[in-house]
Amino acid sequence: MRVVTASLRGELLAVDEPTTVETEYGERKLAELQLRPTDGTDTDGDVTVDVTLWAKWADTAAHAEAGMDLVVTDPEVDEYQGEVTYSTTKESYVVLEPDFLVDVTAIRSWVQCPRMYYLNKLSAIPLNYPVVKGTIVHDVFGDLLRGRDLDAAIEDRVAEAGLELGLLGRDVAEVEGEVRGNAAAIEGWLAQGTLTDEDAWRSEYTLISPTFGLKGRADALRRGMPVELKTGKNTSREPRFQDKIQAAAYALMLDERGVDVDTGTLLYTKNTTLERTEESGDLSPAKEFTMGKGLLEFVVRSRNELAAMEARQEVPTGYEADAKCEYCFEQDTCMVVSGRLDQESKAGAVGRPIPDEEREYFERFYQAIEAERRAVHDEYRKLWEQGDQERADDDRALIGLEPLGQREIEGNRWELRARKPDDAVSKLREGDVALASEGDPVEGHAELCRITELGEEVVVTTDEPVSLQRLDVYPSELSVDRMLTALHDTVLKSNDDRKDVLFGRREPAFDDGRETFIDNNEGQNRAVNLAVNAQDCALIHGPPGTGKTYTIARLIRALVDCGDRVLLTAFTNRAVDNALEALRDQGFEDICRVGTDTGIREDMLDVQLETRGDPHERAAELRNSPVVAATTASCGSRVMREQSFDVAVVDEASQLTEPSALAALNLADRFVLVGDHEQLPPVVQAAD
């Protein structure tokens, strides 16, 4: 494998259909394209060039359209009568829409079935035991790579997952035993003689590829080779094909950095728990495979299909792949979604379509959310398009940091410290997830980190140490993903009565009760009465200075007195904590605050939900709290999505997009929106 050293890039102006021609080597497939180069050539913006894609790269032309961007690496350049033409070579890769950074796990899903990729976007990873145990095993894997004692690592990581395990009703000893069984494969493999003192390990390694349009976090790198951990079993000699795809995608990104990757390893940890008398085949957990050029090309072509579909804003049907629906564990879900949204699907469809207005609502917001995703990808692109000073001037990075040291801290993580220049400012905030690097966040060594202090000194925590010389805003698709899930849950899972109100088919209903909750302000008292008597929803509007926060606190107390469990939420941590402060000022303390140490105000940390510890105690604290407070973003987490409330009270509602608000409203039977539409509107990144 060779390093990518040259490329042609530009906007497609015309795309011909693939065809077959006779050459001196026999029949070959090709496709002709017309491109306006944007870099990689000496031509200016008015010049167009012809590009020939040979062999399997011609298949990419079937997915390309005028207006898309294209990259051809290592092209052959010919000139005839003043005309410059380009064509692919044996070393070439062809990349469609390289600015759309496809996550490696998305390609894995796409290769299994494009329809599965789509379904995974709509429905978030649920809170279930295999997912939680898998996370624990992965964390133990990282600990063992750093030389930590196995028993200590297992005990610590199981305790770390205490809340989730408690919500699932799991016993600590049982979980530790199962994790130990999986970890035996890791420990045994690390003890093999194939590993030497010269082996350099990195775990959870962040990779970004501007050339291939890829991003992801490799489970581990050993001497630059990707190692992927799977908590399931595989008794075949070869790794599963979709697992090879995942490792090969990391190899491509490493190749772009000049790392010569020719081998990948898949570690199936459940194999060590199998009994030879019960299972046949190859029970060895570690399965290595060779990274051939054909496999790497297949990864890029698959990625191109996905990126092209997203560029066309289409929904996959499943016919794009050879997957057999009858063997798919998502078949039933696929058929239900297809039936309800009236979509074409290889698996077929069941059920009646939802009303046209609901389907139109879903499609409109689906496209709006995906536009937001593309805006996030534009921010990724700035990581390599903008220079150091340009990013600093744009407040997107802190540069010129002076490293002050690093130390290992609790949880087998690292604390990094650096001094920042006196005049340095940025959009970074304490609690943010950012990208810490030695100076080049894309081609150099970089680690995802969480900012814990941001004053004269910068303090961050990471999984692995790095010399902290630069800190960049790291774009995240988490909010986009959670908005999609909220949209899916509202349209496809909400009961018809709730949707009748949301879509205006029925007026909200109210009881006739009347009490005095606030005796010195009739407007506030009327607002509390309205909300308490709401059978469906209520809107409370109040300009600045009208006492909305005080009213919210009194409303929550009244709802709890009625026996309701209440979700208090808002777009920002600041708004949530301000409402909590007002509630506590009124003497109410039976509160559970969901969030991180860096996100929650210091004087509210005493009511923070502790996620670490005894599973039953952690789960009981959350379940038994009559008032749970969290941001709307946190409402989309897998823990919060398992909770149910009688009423959701949403402060500063005007700052929320509809899908962001739905993440909270989906958790409650009734809701109250509080805010002022004349104040701050929702924050969005997409221009549309």
Language-model features, listed with the residues they occupy:
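Metal-dependent nuclease catalytic cores that hydrolyze phosphodiester bonds in DNA/RNA
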Residues: D59-A218, I245
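Conserved helicase motor core of SF1/SF2 NTP-dependent helicases
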Residues: C562-D564, A570-R574, Q586, R618-A619, ...
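Pre-ATPase regulatory/linker segments immediately N-terminal to the P-loop/RecA-like helicase/translocase core
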Residues: T272-F289, K293, F298-L306, E430-N520, ...
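ASCE P-loop NTPase motor cores of helicases and related translocases
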Residues: P465-V628
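Mg2+/Mn2+-dependent nuclease catalytic core
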Residues: K29, T38-A66, A200-N304, V425-S426
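Single-stranded nucleic-acid-binding OB-fold domains
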Residues: M1-M68, P75-K90, P98-L101, T211, ...
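Cysteine-cluster motifs in flexible loop/terminal segments that predominantly coordinate metals
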Residues: V111-Y117, S302-G351
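Accessory interdomain/linker segments of ATP-dependent helicases and helicase-like nucleic-acid enzymes
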Residues: M1-E27, Q331-P441
